[in-house]
């Protein structure tokens, strides 16, 4: 699968309502979009439009964290993930990482700026990224044409598509595509649920099954 899939009304209304309410009840920690010491990594490509801002994060799950504690949000989020992935005609294999990111306006963040373009995991570039938007806000997700190559950074990034957050919508794309968030300018906050997943091996863009899609509004955009 090497396309960008976008869907509105991607969850049943009761599930979407639960997310849009409970994201305000989570405990968040202060973090950077990308840490300063990561900017030289081959999976990060800052450019003249980059503004690296502070964000608030609620971490739900990371596959490399073997501590026995389980975040109570993991089960309902995994349930919702399965609905969204199957709505695109795929089957999810594993959840690799789950977190909630919150960005707020910054006085130095200008229209056309974005946070550091990156891939989420340089060691697992074959993963998939699903971003769920629980609320309406500004602060587009930037998806670039360029893909990760462990031997060479792209010299320049070109924008393929911008996704404006719309409540109860999601976007799915392969994890080797460079992407970036952007801070809201008009809204008081931008909240998204960021998911890294793997798909079952026998599901590819050639056998994607949408016949049983229970929701309307599937669009296939940006097919390479």
Language-model features, listed with the residues they occupy:
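Non-heme Fe(II)/2-oxoglutarate
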Residues: 1-91, 214-221
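Catalytic core of non-heme Fe(II) oxygenases with the double-stranded beta-helix
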Residues: 68-193, 198-215
